[in-house]
Amino acid sequence: MREKGNTKVVELASGENYPDALSMTSMAIKDKAPILLTKKDSIPMYTKKALAEWDIETVKIAGLHKAISKEVEKQIDEGFSIAKGNKIDSNIYDGALSVLRYGGANRYETSTVIAAATHPKSSIVVYATGENFPDALVAGNYAGRKKAPVLLVNRDSLPSVIKEYNENSNIRKIVVIGGVNAISDYVFDLILND
């Protein structure tokens, strides 16, 4: 049962591919909203039930259509009923008043889109590898408490979209989560000197 936080907003991310959900953590903390998971082409029953029971008005989707399809977005926007066998359950979701999508061509670009939307003036940025989830999972909670975005990077190279984000931001403090096996010294130096 949901008793605290923002009762009208949820973040929706792929439960099949973790990076967008990790990038969305800071936004969820800022919004005081949960992250619900979905499949690319269908909404799991537990997510449908949450949307219907909570009567969500705003849904923020992490990732473009290759992560979460237009069909899922349409169901979120227009609503749905939940069937139990041959009967319609009392849980009917009338659709969101607002559906917002935050995504880019890949996980790195998506992290910058979410960062710019969530904390556009943050002077702190948290970096974590986009290649596995443990460090980024820790980074999301830390970033949310510091009102900072999480940017995902490669182990051995700094994506150009991250360089561009760094150049156009007012970053005064960086936090890199993970050791050299997650983010190489080379990338760490690029982040420091960007």
Please place each PLM-identified region on the residue numbering:
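Extracellular glycan-binding segments that recognize GlcNAc-based cell-wall polysaccharides
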Residues: 1-194
